[in-house]
């Protein structure tokens, strides 16, 4: 009996549709198949098709304590298909995580003059040259197009803080490195209050500070508009000056491209949770006001889900665990409590770091501000400054190791 081999020929359009349904980690491998496939995958059409197909899918993200410590990591999502937590791909044994913006990560060696910006999963890194004057890492901001794809980034470093107006206000002397020019520029920004803690958080091109000499306000500066040399002031919503009330706990976070202010207030009958979104006109919109069940106990808001403003993550001080709470469905789940939990099988929870971090924050009675390390919805290359060569992760590790060894030798010979 004769057996016939049949070859099925698929059109380019069908192949494109098939590719768009694969995780980015797999799609990246197809770029090396041929120049045609590489051109197709790097086209604007394919990029938009992929994002459209995966618009309801989450992407890998981690909740981190500034520095090197990973609290919670979500991976294995359909968008990237990572087998491990996002922080695994960052050479944290050698570098400190300073900031993140639209999938780009800013890391530094212990010497603030040495820092890198890159995508840890794509293993693409840009070495940022030192500024003219020694300064400390301040933040990472980025510029995106209408589809949310990164066009460029800026690294901001703090050179000097000048106290003004009899210790009421201050001026910041900063250096700004642009990926579009590859050079540092210097500028001075004026703040109407004293900044008591320079831990900041960023969204797009804007840096925000909330630890100020004046309670109940934020200050912000957009490094891409730069129409003014003044921080603008944003009053926090419904702020009754609970700064020293242990029943009041707040956090600044981001979700779905907006700054979010979330807070809890323990009352005799229930725990009240509120969430506001900062609109583009600097007004606050109340999204949630809801009583949470007493089974959660005395809890602290940690962060909103970066892609779903219905979901908040909370830390239970009484029971020492992280709760993922869906505000719309009223369902909650303790992360890491069930080994066979299908909804969170790709969730990494660092229990000791969670306890250490949240105990320190709660002990200081400060607002919670954790770093949301979020991969983008597309594997866009890191914007490369003019005449700068891209480095891979192995090269970064080798470079930093060599610097550390040289520093140790110089110290021993002093």
UniProtKB/Swiss-Prot annotation:
Domain of life: Eukaryota
Domain F-box, residue spans: 5-52
Official protein name in the record: F-box protein At3g26010
Organism annotation: Arabidopsis thaliana
């Amino acid at each position: 009996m004769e057996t016939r081999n049949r070859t099925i020929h698929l059109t380019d359009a069908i192949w494109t549709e098939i590719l768009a349904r694969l995780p980015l980690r797999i799609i990246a491998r197809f770029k090396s198949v041929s120049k045609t496939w590489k051109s197709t995958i790097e086209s604007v059409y394919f990029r938009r098709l992929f994002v459209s197909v995966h618009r309801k899918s989450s992407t890998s993200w981690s909740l981190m304590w500034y520095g090197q410590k990973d609290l919670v990591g979500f991976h294995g999502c359909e968008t990237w298909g990572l087998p491990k937590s996002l922080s695994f791909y960052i050479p944290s044994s050698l570098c400190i995580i300073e900031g993140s913006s639209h999938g780009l990560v800013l890391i530094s060696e212990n010497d603030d003059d040495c820092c890198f910006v890159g995508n840890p999963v794509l293993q693409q890194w840009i070495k940022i040259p030192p500024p003219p004057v020694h300064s400390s890492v301040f933040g990472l901001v980025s510029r995106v197009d209408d589809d949310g794809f990164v066009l460029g980034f800026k690294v901001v470093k703090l050179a000097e803080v000048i106290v003004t107006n009899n210790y009421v206000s201050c001026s910041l002397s900063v250096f700004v490195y642009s990926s579009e020019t590859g050079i540092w520029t210097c500028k001075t920004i004026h703040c109407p209050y004293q900044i008591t803690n320079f831990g900041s958080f960023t969204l797009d091109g804007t840096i925000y500070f909330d630890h100020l000499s004046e309670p109940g306000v934020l200050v912000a500066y957009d490094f891409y508009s730069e129409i003014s040399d003044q921080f603008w002031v944003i009053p926090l919503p419904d702020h009754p000056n609970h700064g020293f009330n242990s029943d009041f706990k707040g956090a600044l976070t981001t979700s779905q491209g907006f700054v979010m202010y979330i807070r809890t207030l323990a009352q005799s009958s229930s725990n009240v949770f509120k969430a506001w979104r900062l609109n583009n006109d600097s007004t606050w919109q109340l999204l949630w006001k809801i009583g949470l069940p007493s089974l959660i106990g005395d809890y602290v808001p940690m962060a909103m889900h970066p892609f779903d403003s219905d979901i908040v993550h909370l830390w239970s001080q009484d029971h020492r665990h992280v709760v993922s709470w869906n505000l719309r469905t009223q369902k909650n789940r303790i992360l890491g409590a069930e080994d066979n939990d299908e909804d969170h099988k790709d969730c990494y929870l660092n229990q000791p770091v969670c306890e250490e971090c949240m105990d320190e924050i709660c002990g200081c009675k400060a607002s919670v501000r954790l770093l949301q390390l979020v991969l983008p919805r597309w594997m866009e290359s890191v914007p490369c400054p003019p005449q700068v060569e891209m480095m891979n992760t192995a090269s970064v590790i080798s470079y930093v190791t060599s610097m550390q060894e040289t520093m140790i030798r110089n110290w021993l010979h002093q």
